[in-house]
Amino acid sequence: MSEESTWVLQAQQGDDEAFTRLVEHYQTPVYNLCYRMLGEPEAAEDASQEAFMRAYQNISRYDRQRPFATWLLSITAHYCIDRLRRRKFGFISLDDEGEDDDRPFELPDANAINPEHATVQREEQAQVHEALQGLDATDRAAIVLRYWYDFSEIEISENLGLTVSAVKSRLFRARKAVARLLQKNAPAPHLERMPYGSPAL
């Protein structure tokens, strides 16, 4: 049994210290997801705390056959979607249909060594972050879970309550929407999946 599995089992048995270890282990990816969804550091901090509280309250119902990270990040994404809807963020039209696009969606590498290149990439990351804020809450969750957290289309469908075909359509539309928003200022950077533990944009 892995160390994480031990913490989960102990937390399910009422060990608060074990749950604290889980919080320490996942606080960065949870915060990053909240920040990419909500766009504000203070809101992301509040949402992170709420997500962990909800996980704590429901830990006894967690199925250990399922990856803990997937379960925790799904709770986080759902809370962020609810929070965005309560804020009544502006929504973009989802009427345009399109076929699925398997081309890679590449994000600039935050660990670039060349200083000038790193500066350009930080600017591109800021543009991507700004573009994400223009998406529908569910589309934003789908694209962030897919390309930052490497969720499969099936996992996204299960966690967001969508069909796989709906997930594919939303990802396609979201990619086009992000590219369209980025092109207002500069050529769209190629987007690729990044580890969920990478620094928030």
Ranges and model annotations:
Residues 10, 92, 130, 158-161, ...:
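C-terminal edge and immediately downstream basic/flexible tail or linker adjoining helix-turn-helix-like DNA-binding
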Residues 12-13, 39-40, 50-67, 86-88:
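Sigma70-family region 2
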Residues 60-64, 74-95, 121, 173, ...:
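Arg/Lys-rich amphipathic alpha helix in sigma70-family domain 2
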Residues 32, 46-53, 57, 66-78:
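Structural recognition of an alpha-helix C-terminal capping motif at a helix-to-coil junction
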Residues 126-141, 145-166, 180:
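Helix-turn-helix DNA-binding module
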Residues 2, 101-130:
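Acidic, proline/glycine-rich intrinsically disordered inter-domain spacer in sigma factors
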Residues 84-107, 119, 189-192:
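Short, basic/polar amphipathic helix motif occurring as a linker/hinge flanking DNA-binding modules
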Residues 12-21, 31-50, 164, 187-188:
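Short, charged helix-capping/linker segments at alpha-helix termini
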